[in-house]
Amino acid sequence: MKKLIYIIVGIAGILGALSRYYLGLTIHEFWHHTFPLATLLINLAGCFLLAWLTTYIAKRNLLPSDVITGIGTGFIGSFTTFSTFSVETVQLINYSEWSIAFLYVSCSILGGLIMSGLGYTLGDFLLKKHLTEGDHL
């Protein structure tokens, strides 16, 4: 049964990568500026989702642990992209787009922490709500 985790993570990884690719294409349809908005929004969404998943879904045991691992490591891990963030930042610097690079790095780091905090806060709030209503973990 433990070999199933590799399949779950692999399938979730495929779905996360495809979701990132198509969402990126969709954002690029509407955003035609130098600032890499698609990567930023995708990474911020991933920060929120991973924090919420690990704070609420995992602690409530709403899904089997293998599925949670698949979503967190596979889907969210392939949906978000640190390497694209890094390469886009280096490209902005190479093109002397210093202010955009600084804004991008700042928004990515601060925004990622804020979105993780919001995901954690929402998950914690929902967890406490269910516990006060007499639900069990």
From Swiss-Prot:
Residues reported to bind Na(+): 77, 80
Organism: Bacillus thuringiensis subsp. konkukian (strain 97-27)
GO MF annotation: an example: fluoride channel activity
Compartmental location: Cell membrane
PANTHER family in UniProt: FLUORIDE EXPORT PROTEIN 1-RELATED
Chain coiled-coil ranges: none
Entries under NCBIfam families matching the protein: crcB
GO cellular component: plasma membrane
Underlying gene: fluC1
HAMAP family in UniProt: FluC
Function: Fluoride-specific ion channel. Important for reducing fluoride concentration in the cell, thus reducing its toxicity.
Taxonomic superkingdom: Bacteria
Full protein name: Fluoride-specific ion channel FluC 1
